[in-house]
Amino acid sequence: MYRTAKGEEIFVIDGHTHFWDGSPANQKNIHGKQFIECFYAYHSNLSPPSEKWEKEKFEKYDAKTMFEDLFVTGYDDMAILQPTYLTDFYKNGFNTTERNSAMKKTHPDRFILNGAFDPRDGNKGLEDLHALSEKHKLKGVKLYTAEWRGESKGYKLSDKASYKYLEAAQKLGIKNIHVHKGPTIIPLNRDAFDVADVDDVATSFQDLNFIVEHCGLPRLDDFCWIATQETNVYAGLAVALPFIHSRPG
């Protein structure tokens, strides 16, 4: 709960949290090492000195610390767990729905669990999405369009395969589509996070909400034009918020 200077209490739902494991023991290859080191560099450069973590602590977020950060010392009342699989880089994935579900199971009244899908997984992926939705009663998914999968280094929401998955999500009652469209982390490709494909699917799927995580950075202007036009497009401000402190001008 956040209390304003006037004493007003505001119920806080944190829309973007990750319960990750980027530790050396979980790294599958050099790319896993590159990813967590770049991720840590963002943390180091955008956090106040008093809030900077040691690298070993940052590499693998433990459940006790996460709960205390969010709900004891932090202002959160509830939080949405957003998965980021990256199974080409990490043996057990970086931050899977399964890993997140352990947090949800331990603290069911505190966490909202989102799932994920990747249209490159074909019919098997559609079956998995149905099973995931049935198991966890999903209302949202987190998509990572720049994720590497074999020789593929990303996909677009406007691809035909993506349409099949969005249609399936709609039928399953998965209304909130969270899409990472923000700063690139090594070794992922910047252009694979281009926000332009949101425009197409937002028009085609009016009953879905598209939450553009990190509001399209570094393509903020493009995002703003799309969000102005499309009434079902919203900004997720994670990562964007720290820039207010680091670059207030």
Which ranges hold each PLM region?
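Helix-coil boundary/capping segments in enzymes
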Residues: M1-G249
